Every structure is written in structure tokens, then in C-alpha cells.
Amino acid sequence: MHGESPIKRRESRKIWVGNVPVGGDAPIAVQSMTNTDTNDVAATVAQIQRLVDAGVDIVRVSVPDMDAAEAFGKIKQLVSVPLVADIHFDYKIALRVAELGVDCLRINPGNIGREDRVRAVVDAARDRGIPIRIGVNAGSLEKDLQKKYGEPTPAALVESALRHVEHLDRLDFQDFKVSVKASDVFMAVEAYRLLAKQIVQPLHLGITEAGGLRSGTVKSAVGLGMLLAEGIGDTIRISLAADPVEEVKVGYDILKSLHLRSRGINFIACPSCSRQNFDVVKTMNELEGRLEDLLVPLDVAVIGCVVNGPGEAKEAHVGLTGGTPNLIYIDGKPAQKLTNDNLVDELEKLIRQKAAEKVEADAALIVRG
């Protein structure tokens, strides 16, 4: 039953992506990106709905051409979550999705083209209250910066970002957020640290092209964990070569581990050993699958023996300690004994009961407040 995070977040300007606040005192928003063909409206909408069910706050959609822009407009009408249009090279695509109701434009002013084209995009965004994300990536730095630095470096990423920030400053546009992504953890972390000291706009965190489900999760957790623990970051996207729904799950798990955001069950479970009095791994796998729909923030401890079990269980909303018989704790106090027969069924029932009680108690607090 952990309290608030001890992390002091960096002060930043608040912007709005649709109805989702980003920056300032807003919760850190979790983003993902579709990997369907945007022209396949049905498939893209279906994937977005799966992301919404997983708890995503903002979804980015690639819009590579005008056909995709028209498809984007149809998609926008069929979903409720804020959508970011990912646009490169052709400024007319940005103008079109602005007309169609996009919630945020992800652009790199450096590849949009001449000053008048950037101004046209910014004017369209300003007129419709649409924020912009300046997205700098180590894999697509400007040629002059590649020549100056020889290779991507944190300083090169920040110089590119500040160049684009100054560009928007000249156009008197402040409704934007910035990212400086790299696939190398140290490069990305240092770039974000440097940039955080120089601008007040919200920062979109990510380790780009992090890898597959396992390797990408580890790299993202290490890199984003370092930054978030320092108070840097206002929205995150976990880039995985995997089902985008996994990006949302990993994002929430990272935030939960730092007590920055709570959604669903926070499991505390031992890796198990020969002391276990029930099959911890099997129990955990079953519980995670069964309770995936539960959104109420709860700490649940599943410990196989009495070495650490009682101590962990006493700190959880619901705790299971292996023994003969096993002992259930509710809100830190011994509540009942369970045998291994129907253990998962009984534990699931108790967790759902505790979740319902918590919802009722929270609602009562709101009414009294």
C-alpha cells in the first residue's frame, strides 16, 4: 500500500492533446502508435480500440500521403481517444489533417521545407488550437549537424531540437512538446537531461527503435526510468517491435514502479524456490490473465513461503503467503487460511472484492469532499 511518489517533477508548460493534458501538473500520459496500414480504416480503428481498452491516453497514427490523410479523417470520427498525426516531408498533409480534426501534429520542421510551408502548418495549428510535437531522432539528424558532430551525439540532438524550438518561437507559437530520441540509452538520457535545462515545454520521452518485446522493454525501462526518477518527462511512448498493446502495458508498469501513475494491479511476487508451498509461477500467470480487466490500483503480494511472505503481505491490499495452510492478508492483517485447492479462484474473488470496496470507499470520499 504505497503512497505518493517522492519524485519532484520538472516544471513545464501544460498543453492539451485533445482532452488530455500534457505537462504542468498533469499525470504522465501514456502513448502508443498504430502499426496497421492507415488506409485500412477498419483494422486501424480496431487496433486503436484495443489500445484504449489497455488504457492508452494518446494514439499516434502515421500519415504518409494524402490517401492516408483522408483515411485518418474517417478514423478520427470513429474513435474517442486523442489522435496524433505523424507527418514528414509534405506540409500539405499536415494542413489536410488539421482540417479533419487532428488532435496533435508530429512534425520535424526541418523536413517540412521552406519557411513559408512551416508557417502555413503553424498557422493552421494555431487557428484550430492544435499542438505540435517536434520530434528529433538520432537516425534522421540534419546533414549539417551530421557533418558538424561526425555522428549522432546528445549535443547534436539538442542543437537540432533547439533549432526547431527557435523556429516556432519566431512564429510566436508555444503550444508544443519536444522529443529527442535515440536507440542508445545513454545518448537519449543525456540529450533529454540537457534539453530539460533549456526549455519549459513538455517533454515526450522514448527510446526509439528499442527492439523486441523483451529487449525493448528492458532498454525502455532503464532509459525512461532514469529520466522519470529525475523528474524529467511529461508523456511516454515505449517503442517495441511487438503488439502496440504491449507498449501501453509496459508504459504503465514503468510508471507504477516509480509511483508516478496507478492503474490496475501492482503485483509483488517472489521468483519461487524449493521452499514454495504452492506453484508461484503458475499462480501469477493465471492471476495476471484473469485480472487484466481490473483497473483499480491495488497492491497484491504473492509469496511462496514464510521467509518474506508475511512482511510483503502486510504491505499489500491483498497478500498471499505460502504455508500449511496458506495465509491470506487483507490490508496488512491476517484474514483467512486457504489450501492449494481452488487457490487461484479464491484469491481472484478476494482481490475483486477488495477492488469493489476500494471503489466504493473512494466514491464516498469524493462525495464527502
UniProtKB/Swiss-Prot annotation:
<dbReference type="GO" id="GO:0019288">
    <property type="term" value="P:isopentenyl diphosphate biosynthetic process, methylerythritol 4-phosphate pathway"/>
</dbReference>
<keyword id="KW-0411">Iron-sulfur</keyword>
<comment type="pathway">
    <text>Isoprenoid biosynthesis; isopentenyl diphosphate biosynthesis via DXP pathway; isopentenyl diphosphate from 1-deoxy-D-xylulose 5-phosphate: step 5/6.</text>
</comment>
<feature type="binding site">
    <location>
        <position position="305"/>
    </location>
    <ligand>
        <name>[4Fe-4S] cluster</name>
    </ligand>
</feature>
<dbReference type="InterPro" id="IPR011005">
    <property type="entry name" value="Dihydropteroate_synth-like_sf"/>
</dbReference>
<dbReference type="InterPro" id="IPR045854">
    <property type="entry name" value="NO2/SO3_Rdtase_4Fe4S_sf"/>
</dbReference>
<feature type="binding site">
    <location>
        <position position="312"/>
    </location>
    <ligand>
        <name>[4Fe-4S] cluster</name>
    </ligand>
</feature>
<dbReference type="InterPro" id="IPR016425">
    <property type="entry name" value="IspG_bac"/>
</dbReference>
<dbReference type="InterPro" id="IPR004588">
    <property type="entry name" value="IspG_bac-typ"/>
</dbReference>
<comment type="function">
    <text>Converts 2C-methyl-D-erythritol 2,4-cyclodiphosphate (ME-2,4cPP) into 1-hydroxy-2-methyl-2-(E)-butenyl 4-diphosphate.</text>
</comment>
<keyword id="KW-0004">4Fe-4S</keyword>
<feature type="binding site">
    <location>
        <position position="270"/>
    </location>
    <ligand>
        <name>[4Fe-4S] cluster</name>
    </ligand>
</feature>
<dbReference type="GO" id="GO:0051539">
    <property type="term" value="F:4 iron, 4 sulfur cluster binding"/>
</dbReference>
<dbReference type="GO" id="GO:0016114">
    <property type="term" value="P:terpenoid biosynthetic process"/>
</dbReference>
<comment type="similarity">
    <text>Belongs to the IspG family.</text>
</comment>
<feature type="binding site">
    <location>
        <position position="273"/>
    </location>
    <ligand>
        <name>[4Fe-4S] cluster</name>
    </ligand>
</feature>
<dbReference type="Pfam" id="PF04551">
    <property type="entry name" value="GcpE"/>
</dbReference>
<dbReference type="GO" id="GO:0005506">
    <property type="term" value="F:iron ion binding"/>
</dbReference>
<keyword id="KW-0560">Oxidoreductase</keyword>
<protein>
    <recommendedName>
        <fullName>4-hydroxy-3-methylbut-2-en-1-yl diphosphate synthase (flavodoxin)</fullName>
        <ecNumber>1.17.7.3</ecNumber>
    </recommendedName>
</protein>
<keyword id="KW-0408">Iron</keyword>
<dbReference type="GO" id="GO:0141197">
    <property type="term" value="F:4-hydroxy-3-methylbut-2-enyl-diphosphate synthase activity (flavodoxin)"/>
</dbReference>
<keyword id="KW-0479">Metal-binding</keyword>
<dbReference type="GO" id="GO:0046429">
    <property type="term" value="F:4-hydroxy-3-methylbut-2-en-1-yl diphosphate synthase activity (ferredoxin)"/>
</dbReference>
<keyword id="KW-0414">Isoprene biosynthesis</keyword>
